Curated annotation (Swiss-Prot):
It is found in: Periplasm. One of its GO terms (biological process) is cellular respiration. Substrate binds at F794. [4Fe-4S] cluster binds at C46, C49, C53, C81. Keywords: 4Fe-4S, Electron transport, Iron, Iron-sulfur, Metal-binding, Molybdenum, Nitrate assimilation, Oxidoreductase, Periplasm, Signal, Transport. SMART domains: Molybdop_Fe4S4. Its EC number is 1.9.6.1. Predicted to be exported by the Tat system. The position of the signal peptide cleavage has not been experimentally proven. Belongs to the prokaryotic molybdopterin-containing oxidoreductase family. NasA/NapA/NarB subfamily. It catalyses: 2 Fe(II)-[cytochrome] + nitrate + 2 H(+) = 2 Fe(III)-[cytochrome] + nitrite + H2O. GO terms for cellular component: membrane; nitrate reductase complex; periplasmic space. This is Periplasmic nitrate reductase. Binds 1 [4Fe-4S] cluster.
Length: 830
């Protein structure tokens, strides 16, 4: 789609149309000129990161012609980042997929054939055959799905019902496993409930901010702008930034800290020791609200059991812990002295002490922010727990301006992956498949026979790759992600399983990504406002939007695909006789009828949708399926501190932060006066735990799974850049963003480059024990690694940096460590 300057000028002048829709257009747009009623404006959350910025979408003749920041959004207040301003263009890439494509040869499916257009009916025919064969031959463990933190709430919920309730397989996991799983397990271990207790309002309340492994300036730029305003307009405010290399967030740092990879664990134990030694502990808070426990150590690295590191581990994968006293904890952290921390981390003592003083000062309200630097870590859960330790020791938690806060990278990693429970071990509202009571709640809510949901945890993301390679997972559906590019160790652990003739791989995507082109069947998928949706952002804010434009060609939403596919399976084909006998009324019914068209999900008629806002899925299925799915899903959490507002409310507001009780959202959880679930007089109650107390864990430093040695002499860290989002499958199709950062480069310290005879712009081969990739040397620019470390973004499909990375994971969260592996460099001679 080509939009002229005149088109954009007209769109931005559409004040009258926006006003008619109850929207506010920024003053700058009001000054553009003449208005037009031909453009319709409506609200939506942004499609990119987990900040949850509000956007106004302008549509005309079935196309998006403009977008701008929503000034009525409390998140971004009319501001978007550079990606947000180009949202319309992600929809209209020249290679947008509009038909199902199957690998075929001589008119038949062939694993080595060419992609050939087919109908949806034929696409589902081959999918049905492959899934039924896998179920018949090997059972529910032979089928699986890899979903997304970009799924809408009801897409994730429908997938959860189909996989765990329909196919009876817990082999459902989201790509959020690669980014937020350590945060999830960390919150659950310490507080018994997932997600931050604070909100973005903390930014305007805090006196200090500490960024742990978070480049907010590029990855969460709108929140960074709010923090920048707070820092520059209040002289007393301080910012500390910790990372293994310098990046743009360092430009505002009062205390810029570059540390040796993995030693963030040492630094946090030092800070805990400093707090105790300087009598900065909030003793009353600890006595009333905190327990102490010693965690298991030497827990391995989440590699295959045959790997030498796993064989050597004393307690591989152990989440065990035992009670301890405050005095025991004091003794434990005492060994993490300032001198030891400085020596191990490479950080000057004065910088470490300055950082510790921020946490220790009772007059300083402090927020800790982190993203992938903490979570993509072989001890990511520990890192999360250790950060909570600092806030619990000082009582700086669950109060305006103070608290630990994990920032999410996807628009609904919280709302869908975490809250809906699309992980292999989870169910909605923090319930888990290993808990019999939780399974019973789900089975009752879904009207399923007792015993339908398996109690064994399914395959997580990396385990799915291994099972595909081993031939034990044979029918596999990937939706709304590009894991062939984004996941670790492509050469050894992913590509072999995808191309194994025993396996059938389906990818649903709007574009021909690396993942799509590696699959056997590609299903064209609707994007963003081509469907009605809901996302949940990092501050627990649930936001809705209406379908605003049609999908191109034959593209269908993930929701439609999941629900329509359910029609292909009768209960007798997927459930054993003993389950069917419990529900004889289900005999002859298919999973669509049992899970979706069941008078619970299907009880909301089309008449509840405004005439001009009917969405494609509701029209196709004949009922307001989004409302039915949402209300059923919301029933899991209501009354249990996961309360969501009624469905219709969300279409009228700019999101609400749960728990929502009596129409009021909750800004700070666990604190009396803010949280309706804290009884009067208790002040603070961490009610996720049976005794209402959070846990401080004693956890040590343990080394990375792979470190530089004489041959592979450099650390490699991977990540993102401002202009591109994840694998670039959307942003690289925006000409302006592509031109701004057209290809990946290898950021390296100038002296490391010089020592290897490399110059800026040279081609260089980056080699690990698992693979190699050719990139370009960059010794200047926004990212400035220290000596001994190189940094490379993963957005470039022509430079698959995950050919290099190790599939080591945190043994507790199963999240991959993309920040630490060992590489060497070779100059490429032209």
């Amino acid at each position: 789609m080509k939009l002229s300057r005149r088109d954009f000028m007209k769109a931005n002048a559409a004040v009258a149309a926006a006003a008619a829709a109850g929207m506010t257009i920024p003053t700058v747009a009001k000054a553009v000129g003449e208005t037009t009623n031909a453009i319709k404006w409506d609200k939506a959350p942004c499609r990119f990161c987990g900040t949850g910025c509000g956007v106004l979408v302008g549509t005309q003749n079935g196309r998006i012609v403009a977008s701008q920041g929503d000034p009525d959004s409390p998140v971004n207040r009319g501001l978007n980042c550079i990606k947000g301003y180009f949202l319309p263009k992600i929809m209209y890439g020249k290679d947008r997929l509009t038909q199902p494509l199957l690998r075929m040869k001589d008119g038949q499916y062939d694993k080595e054939g060419d992609f050939t257009p087919i109908s949806w009916e034929k696409a589902f025919d081959i999918m049905e055959l492959k899934f039924k064969n896998a179920l018949k031959e090997k059972g529910p463990t032979a089928v699986g799905m890899f979903g997304s933190g970009q799924w809408t709430v009801w897409e994730g919920y429908a997938a959860l019902k189909l996989l765990k309730g329909g196919f009876r397989s817990n082999n459902l996991d989201p790509n959020a496993r690669h980014c937020m799983a350590s945060s999830v397990v960390g919150f659950m271990r310490t507080f018994g409930m997932d997600e931050p207790m604070g909100c973005y309002d903390d930014i305007e309340e805090a006196d200090a901010f500490v960024l742990w492994g978070s480049n907010m300036a590029e990855m969460h730029p709108v929140l960074w702008s709010r923090m920048t305003s707070r820092r520059l307009t209040n002289a007393h405010v301080r910012i500390a930034v910790l990372s293994t290399y310098e990046h743009r967030s360092f430009e505002l740092a009062d205390n810029p800290i570059v540390f040796t990879p993995q030693t963030d664990l040492v630094i946090m134990n030092y800070i805990a020791n400093y707090i105790i030694q300087n009598n900065a502990v909030d003793k009353d808070f600890l006595a009333q609200h905190v327990n102490f426990r010693r965690g298991a150590t030497d827990i391995g690295y989440g590699l295959r059991p045959t790997h030498p590191l796993e064989k050597a581990a004393k307690n591989p994968g152990s989440d065990a812990s035992e009670p301890m006293s405050f005095e025991d904890f004091k003794t434990f952290v005492a060994e993490y002295t300032l001198e030891k921390a400085a020596k191990m981390s490479g950080v000057p003592e004065d910088q470490l002490e300055s950082l510790a003083q921020l946490y220790a000062d009772p007059k300083v309200k402090l927020v800790s922010y982190w993203t992938m630097g903490f979570n993509q870590h072989t001890r990511g859960v520990w890192a999360n727990n250790m950060c909570y330790n600092l806030h619990l020791l000082t009582g700086k938690i669950s109060t305006p301006g103070s608290g630990p806060f994990s920032l999410t990278g996807q628009p609904s990693a919280c709302g869908t992956a975490r809250e809906v429970g699309t992980f292999s071990h989870r169910l909605p509202a923090d319930m888990v498949v290993t808990n019999e009571k939780h399974r019973q709640i789900a089975e009752t809510t879904w009207q399923l026979p007792a015993g339908t949901i398996p109690e064994k945890v399914g395959l997580h993301a990396v385990a799915q790759d291994r099972a595909l390679k081993d031939g034990t997972l044979n029918a596999y559906w990937v939706m709304c992600n590009n894991n062939m590019q984004a996941g670790p160790n492509i050469n050894e652990e992913r590509m072999p399983g995808w191309r194994d003739p025993r396996n059938f791989i389906v990818v649903s995507d709007p574009y021909p990504t690396i993942s799509a082109l590696s699959a056997d069947l590609i299903l064209p998928t609707s994007m963003w406002v081509e469907k009605e949706g809901a996302y949940g952002n990092a501050e627990r804010r649930t936001q809705f939007w209406r379908q605003q434009v049609p999908s191109p060609g034959e593209a269908k939403s993930d929701l439609w695909q999941i629900v329509e596919f359910a029609k292909r399976f009768n209960v007798e084909e997927v459930w054993p006789a003993e389950l069917v006998n419990q529900k004889p009324e289900y005999r002859g019914k298919n999973l669509y009828e049992v899970l979706f068209a069941n008078d619970v999900v299907s009880k909301y008629p089309l008449s509840e949708i405004p005439d001009d806002q009917l969405n494609d899925e509701a029209r196709d299925f004949g009922f307001y399926i989004q409302k039915g799915l949402f209300e059923e899903y919301a029933s899991f959490g209501r009354g249990h501190a996961h309360d969501l507002a009624p469905f219709d409310v969300y279409h009228q507001v700019r999101g609400l932060r749960w728990p929502v009780v009596d129409g009021k959202e909750t800004l700070w959880r666990y604190r009396e006066g803010f949280d309706p679930f804290v009884p009067k007089g208790e002040e603070v109650r961490f009610y996720g735990k049976p005794d209402g107390k959070a846990v401080i864990f004693a956890l040590p430093y343990e080394p990375a799974a792979e470190s530089p040695d004489q041959e592979y002499d450099l650390w490699l860290s991977t990540g993102r850049v401002l202009e591109h989002w994840h694998t670039g499958s959307m942003t690289r199709r925006v000409p302006e963003l592509h031109r701004a950062f057209p290809e990946a480069v290898l950021f390296i310290h100038p002296l490391d480059a010089k020592a290897r005879g490399l110059h800026r712009g040279d081609k260089v081969k980056v080699i690990s024990r698992r693979g190699e990739v050719i990139s370009l040397v960059e010794t200047r620019g926004r990212n400035r690694p220290p000596r001994g470390l190189v940094y490379m973004p993963f957005f470039d499909a022509a430079q698959l940096v995950n050919n290099l990375t190790l599939d080591a994971t945190d043994p507790l969260s199963k999240e991959t460590d993309f920040k630490k592996c060992a590489v060497k460099l070779e100059r490429v001679v032209a």
